[in-house]
């Protein structure tokens, strides 16, 4: 291992100085093995798991400990938060509701399509009622969201989702004819 690589590793993972023996044979594992049964357990509750790198020769018993990021928790904590341009603390809630509305929108369109396919059958009334309920749920969720957000967010939501909502209303009208 070159010296500048060791410095890079020190700065990236441990922020501590490293002792590197001259004749090093490395065996690395991202997790420590807990017992003889083979169960693998993380070494601590921190965001990093320890991996020991030990020398294969029996002449020296020195070992190195590097901290390697535990990818799952490291990713979740450093995940970007996307917002709708608001400076308030509600963007994750708004995004969650928008995702739910989009999901319900897709379900409502499927219900309308199934009702249109059953137009001249005995199942039409049931399918049409399910489609009306699904559209009503989407419209209720969208209006509820518009009532909870600021004017700036409301305008943004109208621009991004208004056309889809109008499309849903038009498809429902077409079903009712």
From Swiss-Prot:
InterPro entries: H3-Acetyl_Activator (IPR053325)
One Gene Ontology term from the biological process aspect of the record: response to cold
GO cellular component, one term: cytosol
Location in or out of the cell: Nucleus
Thylakoid listed as a keyword: no
Coiled-coil regions listed in the entry: 98-118
Entry keywords, A to Z: Activator, Coiled coil, Nucleus, Transcription, Transcription regulation
Induction: Induced by cold and salt. Probably repressed by HAG1/GCN5.
Tissue specificity annotation: Expressed in flowers, leaves, stems and siliques.
This protein's record includes keyword Coiled coil: yes
Subunit structure: Interacts with HAG1/GCN5.
Purpose: Activates gene expression by recruiting HAG1/GCN5 and triggering subsequent histone H3 acetylation of target genes promoters.
UniProt name for this protein: Embryogenesis-like protein
Organism this protein belongs to: Arabidopsis thaliana (Mouse-ear cress)
């Amino acid at each position: 291992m070159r010296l500048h690589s060791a410095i890079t590793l020190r700065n990236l993972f441990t922020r501590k100085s490293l002792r590197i023996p001259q004749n090093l044979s490395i065996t690395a594992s991202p997790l420590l093995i807990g017992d003889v049964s083979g169960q693998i357990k993380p070494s601590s509750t921190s965001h990093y798991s320890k991996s020991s790198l030990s020398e294969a020769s029996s002449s020296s018993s020195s070992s190195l400990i590097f901290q390697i990021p535990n990818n799952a928790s490291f990713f979740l904590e450093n995940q970007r938060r996307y917002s709708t341009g608001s400076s308030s603390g509600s963007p994750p809630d708004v995004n969650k509701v928008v995702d739910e509305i989009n999901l319900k929108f897709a379900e409502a369109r499927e219900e309308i399509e199934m009702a249109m396919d059953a137009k001249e059958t005995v199942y039409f009334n049931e399918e049409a009622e399910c489609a009306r309920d699904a559209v009503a749920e989407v419209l209720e969720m969208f209006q509820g969201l518009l009532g909870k957000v600021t004017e700036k967010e409301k305008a943004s939501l109208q621009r991004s989702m208004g056309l889809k909502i109008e499309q849903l209303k038009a498809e429902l009208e077409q079903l009712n004819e």
